[in-house]
Regions:
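Accessory carbohydrate-recognition regions in carbohydrate-active enzymes
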Residues: 1-338, 342-350, 354-386, 392-443, ...
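ATP-dependent phospho-/nucleotidyl transfer catalytic cores
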Residues: 463
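Selective recognition of specific alpha-helical transmembrane segments in multi-pass small-molecule
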Residues: 497-521
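C-terminal structured "cap/appendage" subdomains that terminate the fold
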Residues: 670-729
Length: 787
């Protein structure tokens, strides 16, 4: 729950607090969400510390976040799992480490060459001045989004003692949803003799009162304590507990988890916890560059950051079930992160599914997005359905109430909520009757954005398909047939003759590529409405398809969403003109239209597998790593709410999931060998591992095409594997070559499964299609061996 870091006043997206630019640090707070986009999230109750005040007058120190910011010393930031530190221009070095519900801060004061009883301070206008060394630490009852409405604060101390306690509470707004939440804080500070203490509101500070029971809305307010100078080499230490239940619970959390104020010991314990969490994966990185290793481990680490375990901290209802928050959003995470967790942390993934079902029991709907105990804005379909089915098909069934799970996903499919902009699905009456979402639909049953008719439709169809899998498994045969049929609804908005054109006022229609056939919106009467197939891509009006717009796709183009038919890729390929045209079309998308900063782009990297060209999936995986995912400051192409990290981690390990299905698409790992602890009970007790080994491994990655494979010593020609490999363990050996040779993964029986609606006899075997060419470095091409 606690993730301590320095907060900045960056004008860039600072939803997670810290931004690596030249912005000023304004505080050190304890609650954060990562990679959310939108408004800043959490960042409640930041601490701030001055090394001293001008003229030794505490009223001349800057208290508000708007004026107290100080620049960081370039290159001083250090981050590792469980630890963050930074040096500021005001003679402060801040270090922080965490436990589950508390943070421990250590503030030291290098003299910066001034020496003696002085330290440097920075004035609000940026001037560096010498001040008497007498640290003043404050607790600000504010958040990153400056959303507080009401609240209170109190400080407890005895003059002449060396310990004080500051507490506070406030009501805040979520960053990407509706409603509000209350949070509570308890900060114990010590390290030197206390000189004075009091409270502040805005720029005004005083020693009295010690208690404010009603802070006006917005702006900085809180408590403060000023110390004598710590002894040589000494520090001011702050232990901060947080809670969503009460101040008493916040104090109890801190006292239970950090009883001794031992910073180094707390840091070691945090490191040990992270080592244990990451130890389920081992790699042989011989020859692999340090930056590539950093990119992999950083991605794996980030995949474990959210959702956050708030069990025991839910003020909304009493329950013995786990409670997880910060699902930011499942529209992002269902594609990569949750499937990865089924492999590396199935206990947490099981708890998350249970938490989703408990939300359904108490709120009435599964969330698509949820943060700070509030309903978040839905971005597409009811994607928790996919997460739940994914858990079932991968046998994460223990302790999950599958009767309630089925009830919940059927509720999404059948029952429209009053406000489907924050849960469930919308336009269901028309969707059920027509099999699509009309652009001119008048929804009398609920309210939500009148947009995203293409992107919502393809997601609704896939979610219905996933529900059909669960229905069949649980014995609901009629439901299974109904939802399987709805899984084919994507065909209702497939416009075969739609060209890749742009309509210009003066130039008329411009044909941009030779490809035809795209998802297009329809009206109630069945007529088509033109939608620029490149709208919301890097080529056209990139940022025009967000929640507050009326376009038919969300954060992506029709070019992109026209590939999203993972339930029946075989038929989609036929609609696109057969395997050869499909492959050319997918290559064109990667070359000309793709943007990897949104999660819908993940699966198309590997969809060449369905066209019998797993070599091209490998090629593009090696293009995006390291061009888009790397160890540089810009080494993540989009906001990472754990999904970007999960994508990178799985690409490095040599597989990618088709979420909601028991399918992982195989590409060569970026390591000689990857070893993952098997998750099945017997396999885990026996210490078995799922091992992916590369024969002819080349750390320059010139050899990146799978020539042949064996699974547990037997020839293996499929280009995909099932979850049993990770559950029971085994050895998958991949022989790689510099050029795509042989027929591995190209035959009709080697392709990932498709689940047609009705019978089809016209599916072309991709193995009968001659390979053309694959791009190589420098824009050249490598010839493929025909077979």
């Amino acid at each position: 729950m606690v993730k301590a870091v320095a907060d900045t006043n960056s004008h860039a997206e600072n939803a997670a607090g810290f931004v690596s630019d030249d912005s000023k640090v304004t505080g050190f707070s304890h609650l954060h969400d990562s990679g959310t986009g939108g408004n800043p999230s959490l960042g409640n109750f930041p601490l701030w510390i001055h090394p001293g005040c001008p003229g030794d007058d505490f009223t001349k120190c800057s208290f508000p976040a708007s004026s107290r910011g100080v620049g960081r010393v370039n290159g001083s930031a250090r981050a590792t799992p469980g630890y963050f530190s930074i040096e500021l221009e005001n003679s402060v070095r801040a270090e922080m480490t965490t436990t589950e519900r508390a943070a421990l801060y250590r503030f030291s004061f290098p003299d910066g060459g001034i020496g003696g009883s002085k330290r440097w301070s920075i004035t609000p206008d940026g001037k560096r001045v010498a001040v008497p060394f007498s640290p003043l630490i404050l607790l600000d009852v504010v958040d990153l989004g400056n959303s507080r409405t009401g609240g209170g604060t109190q400080v407890y101390a005895d003059e002449g003692s060396s310990a004080a306690r500051m507490v506070g509470d406030g009501k805040f707004l979520p960053s990407f949803g509706t409603g509000n939440y209350r949070a509570y804080v308890c900060a114990d500070v010590r390290g030197a003799k206390i000189r004075r203490y009091g409270t502040f509101q805005g720029p005004d500070s005083a020693e009295e009162p010690k208690f404010i029971d009603s802070i006006y809305s917005g702006g900085s307010a809180g408590s403060w304590v000023q110390f004598d100078p710590p002894t040589a080499g000494g520090a001011i230490v702050a232990r901060v507990g947080v809670s969503f239940m009460s101040v008493d619970q916040a104090c109890a959390n801190a006292e239970a988890e950090i009883p001794t104020f031992d910073f180094d010991g707390t840091f070691r314990a945090a490191q040990d916890s992270w080592r244990e969490k990451l130890s389920v994966v081992e790699v042989d990185a011989t020859g692999v560059g340090e930056d590539m290793q950093t990119t992999f481990w950083s991605g794996l680490y980030r995949s474990l950051i959210s959702p956050q375990n708030y069990t025991g901290e839910n003020p909304l209802w009493d329950s013995s079930e786990p409670y997880y928050d910060s699902f930011y959003c499942i529209w992002d995470s269902f594609r990569a992160q949750h499937p990865l967790l089924t492999i590396i942390d199935p206990i947490a993934q099981t708890e998350m599914v249970r938490a989703l079902l408990d939300i359904y029991r108490n709120v009435g709907k599964l969330p698509d997005c949820r943060m700070s105990f509030s309903k978040g804005f839905s971005q597409g379909g009811s994607n928790a359905d996919v997460v739940i089915v994914d858990a079932y098909v991968k046998k994460l069934r223990k302790d999950i109430d599958w009767a309630t799970a089925y009830e919940a996903v059927v509720s999404d499919a059948e029952d429209e909520p009053q406000s489907w902009g924050v849960e469930g699905r919308g336009n269901l009456e028309s969707y059920h009757r027509l099999g699509y979402i009309p652009v001119d639909d008048v929804d009398k049953n609920g309210t939500g954005p009148s947009s995203r008719q293409i992107s919502r439709l393809v997601e609704y169809a896939y979610e219905d398909f996933c529900i059909s899998l669960l229905a069949k498994a649980l014995g609901h045969s009629e439901d299974a047939e109904k939802y399987h049929k709805r899984g084919g609804n994507w065909k209702n908005i497939w416009r075969e003759e739609q060209a890749d054109i742009m309509r210009e006022v003066h130039a008329g229609e411009l044909t941009l590529s030779p490809f035809t056939g795209f998802m297009q919106p329809k009206r109630l009467d069945g007529s088509w409405k033109y939608h620029n197939v490149r709208l919301c891509s890097p080529k056209t009006a990139f940022h025009s398809c967000y929640l507050d717009t009326r376009h038919s796709t969300y954060e992506g183009s029709s070019w992109l969403y026209s590939f999203f038919v993972p339930q029946d890729m075989a038929e989609l390929i036929q609609h696109m003109g057969g395997p050869q045209t499909f492959v050319k079309r997918l290559e064109y998308w990667h070359e000309e239209v793709a943007y990897m900063g949104n999660e819908q782009a993940f699966l198309p990297v590997f969809q060449f597998h369905y066209g019998g060209r797993p070599d091209l999936s490998s090629y593009w995986a090696h293009r995006y790593i390291p061009s888009q995912f790397n160890a540089s400051i810009n080494g993540i192409p989009g906001n990472d709410d754990s999904s970007m990290g999960a994508f990178a981690a799985m690409v490095f390990m040599g597989f990618f999931p088709v979420a909601g299905q028991d399918v992982y698409l195989i590409t060569p790992p970026f390591f000689r060998e990857v070893r993952i602890q098997a998750t099945g009970p017997e396999a885990k007790r026996a210490g078995r591992k799922a091992i992916i080994r590369v024969r002819n491994f080349d750390p320059t990655y010139e050899k990146k095409y799978i020539e042949s494979a064996t699974l547990n010593g037997q020839a293996y020609t499929k280009n995909w594997i099932t979850h049993d490999f990770f559950r029971e363990g085994g050895l998958l050996e991949l022989t790689v070559s510099q050029r795509p040779v042989g027929t591995w993964g190209t035959g009709k029986d080697d392709l990932p499964p498709s689940y047609p609606v009705g019978e089809r006899d016209d599916i072309t075997d991709p193995s009968l299609i001659p390979r053309t060419e694959v791009p190589a470095k420098g824009g050249q091409s490598l010839p493929h061996q025909e077979h």
